[in-house]
Swiss-Prot record:
Part of the 50S ribosomal subunit. One of the primary rRNA binding proteins, this protein initially binds near the 5'-end of the 23S rRNA. It is important during the early stages of 50S assembly. It makes multiple contacts with different domains of the 23S rRNA in the assembled 50S subunit and ribosome. Forms part of the polypeptide exit tunnel. This is Large ribosomal subunit protein uL4. Residues 69-78 have a biased composition (Polar residues). It comes from Desulforapulum autotrophicum (strain ATCC 43914 / DSM 3382 / VKM B-1955 / HRM2) (Desulfobacterium autotrophicum). NCBIfam families: rplD_bact. Belongs to the universal ribosomal protein uL4 family. The keyword Lipid biosynthesis does not apply. GO terms for biological process: translation. It comes from the Bacteria.
Length: 207
């Protein structure tokens, strides 16, 4: 098991936490992380782009003028894709970009992401981060004491005061253990775990 210093809100070491090797110390494969991040981003796409085809644009379907004898090129209706304001051929239509990756691969990628943070010395543990009230200034002061910028904070409960205190701080995000995901872990430079959240995270892989 890997031992990590547990800090208080002033950035001082108060104890040690031990992280399970099967979750925080596994070999990292960039290809697996890439596949899962790509899947997450694909699921976020709205897929709402839409253009009108010739059957959907407004206008008459009558032939504009006779086929022969005018000296002009032959022409059909005003809705032809060849004309200004006509329909679009093979234009975009609403669709879902979401696709699935096996559950075991997603779980493996999450463990790899956690392991990569520990290996890069970008994982920190704090004993508690509970806020008595919604105070953005106080939250920012704690982050400064910890020396962490661009940080993902993982909590094990619904701490409304903490979430709202962090909301306006740029490059800081607070999520619960249930929402922990590969994309957010890799997006932020630092990962800060509440000490009580460690067991919750490790428990996700033993259920």
């Amino acid at each position: 098991m890997a031992a990590v210093d547990v800090l208080n809100r002033s950035g001082e070491k108060v104890s040690e936490a031990f992280l399970a090797d099967e979750v925080f110390s596994i070999p990292v494969k960039k290809s697996v992380l890439h596949d899962v991040v790509r899947m997450q981003l694909a699921r976020r796409r709205s897929g709402t782009a839409k253009s009108k085809g010739r059957s959907e644009v407004s206008g008459s379907t009558r032939k504009l003028y006779r086929q022969k004898g005018t000296g002009n090129a032959r022409s059909g209706s005003v809705k032809s894709p060849l004309r200004r304001g006509g329909g679009v051929i093979f234009g975009p239509a609403p669709r879902s970009y979401a696709y699935a990756i096996p559950k075991k691969v997603r779980a493996l990628a999450l463990k790899m992401a956690l392991s990569s943070k520990l290996a890069a010395n970008e994982l920190s543990v704090i004993d508690t981060f509970a806020m008595d009230s919604i105070k953005t200034k106080e939250f920012d002061s704690i982050i400064d004491h910890l020396g962490l910028k661009n940080t993902l904070i993982v909590i094990d409960g619904d701490d409304r005061n903490l979430v709202l205190s962090a909301r306006n701080i740029p490059d800081v995000k607070v999520i619960r253990t249930e929402g922990l995901n590969v994309y957010d872990i890799l997006k932020y430079d630092n990962l800060l775990l509440i000490e009580s959240a460690i067991k919750e995270i490790e428990g996700r892989f033993t259920r």
